[in-house]
Structures are given as C-alpha cells and as structure tokens.
Amino acid sequence: MLNLSIMPLDTEHIDEIVADIIEQQKTGVSTHAMFMMEFNPEGTPAVNKAEMQCKKYDLFRERLDKSGARHGVLVQATLGHIYTPYEPYSFQPTVSLNNGEERVVTCCPLDPDFRKYIKEQFRILAERHPAVVMLDDDLGLFYRPTNGCACKHHMAEINRRAGKAITREELYQHCLGDTEEDKYYADLYVDVVRDSIVDCVKAMREGLDEVDPTIQGVVSGIYTSTFCEFSDYTAEAFAGKGNP
C-alpha cells in the first residue's frame, strides 16, 4: 500500500526536508515523499512549468536516491483550481452551461492544444523517473460554478453524437427539463464531459509512457464531497499498464 507524504519543493530548506523524508520512511510513517508541482498553464505561449519545477526536483532526487529514499510528484494543478493565472493563456477556458460565461481559472480538457501542452509537461516530468505521479482533485468540472463545460469543443462533440445541432441555451433548458428528450441530452452532456476529462488524463499518461511506462499513476480525491468526480474512470486511465 502507498502511504504518501506531501512535500514542498523548497530548496532553501533542502537539508531539513531530505532528513525528514528519510526519517519518515525509516520509521514507517510514509512510503514515498511526493513533491508538489503545478502544470496548469500560464502565459502565451505557455510557460514550461514542468522544466522549471523539475530543476528543483533534481536537487532533491540526487540526495534521496543516494539514501535509498523513495519519491514521486503530486501534480497539484492540471486543469486549474480556483486561482486566476498571473498571465493569460491561449487555450480554451471552461464555459458555463448556465450563462455562457468563460471561467479562466480552469482549462477545457477537450481543447486539443491544451492536451498537447499537458502531455508534454508529463513527458518532461517522466524524464526524472519518479516512482509515483499523483493527479490532484482539479480534474472535475461538474462541481464548479460552470456546471461542466459548454464551450465550442464540448458543444461540437454533443452535436456530433446527437446528429443534430443545438445551442448551449437549448442544452441548458434540456438539463432542467423532465421529458425523454431532456433526459437524453442531459445524459449525453454528462457523457461528453466525462469522456473529455478521461481522454485528457489519457494524454497525460501518454506523456509518461513515452519515457517511462513503469511509473505508477494515482488519482486523488476528497471522497466525502463532490471532488471524486469520475475518479474511477480517471484512476484507471492514469494508473499505467500493469499497475494497480
């Protein structure tokens, strides 16, 4: 069983942190130290966050590998949590089903350009060969004020599967209704949002697999609330071939 201990990439206190990690694993408090990173995009073009943070990770890896201590990475943000980026990005943000407003704190997981970006971030991380990589609970979309995502990418996929074109406003009304047609579109919307998240996670996994397919993938969640959205699907997609 994994017993993960979250650690900061604080190079100013590297000696104390490394000593703490070694002691934790020696005494059975934890099995792995998980260093926090954030890959949610910022800037146009997007800043290479993975490379910047992995340079700090390298300093810890060198010391921990010599001691035999095990370590991995918690990617604390991929789509984005609740914080507005310091610099705007060029990817598609999520769009509210209710009113059509963009919410820039979260990227749309169906945007093909975002998927290319996030896959490359995980490929760069995999070059450091962490034993475990964990995704944080910002993968969900339905628990957010947007009630999923009704951007151009999601609406196009809904219309493709339905075989007819409807607007965001019509989709919203269907999600409020109780007819058979309403239920069809509400279920279709859930399916499309779920698949967009899962396929985005698969892109992240592909980034790892291009370098090191043995890395154990883990998905976190707060299982007493709504933050476990589709985590059974995403955990399977991210675990890696042959991993639990």
Regions found by a protein language model. Name each.
Residues 143, 197-244:
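Substrate-binding cleft/loops of secretory-pathway carbohydrate-active enzymes
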Residues 7-11, 37-39, 76-80, 138-140, ...:
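Active-site beta-loop-alpha junctions enriched in small/polar residues
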Residues 70-128, 141-145, 152, 158, ...:
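Active-site-adjacent "subsite" loops/lids of carbohydrate-active enzymes
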Residues 20-21, 37-91, 200-208:
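Aromatic-lined substrate-binding rim segments of carbohydrate-active enzymes
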Residues 2-12, 38-54, 100-119, 181-198, ...:
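The substrate-binding groove and active-site-proximal loops of carbohydrate-active enzymes
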Residues 2-6, 32-34, 71-75, 133-135, ...:
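Hydrophobic faces of well-ordered beta-strands that scaffold small-molecule active sites
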Residues 9-25, 113-125, 229-240:
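Short, acidic/polar
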Residues 14-41, 127-132:
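Catalytic domains of carbohydrate-active enzymes, especially glycoside hydrolases
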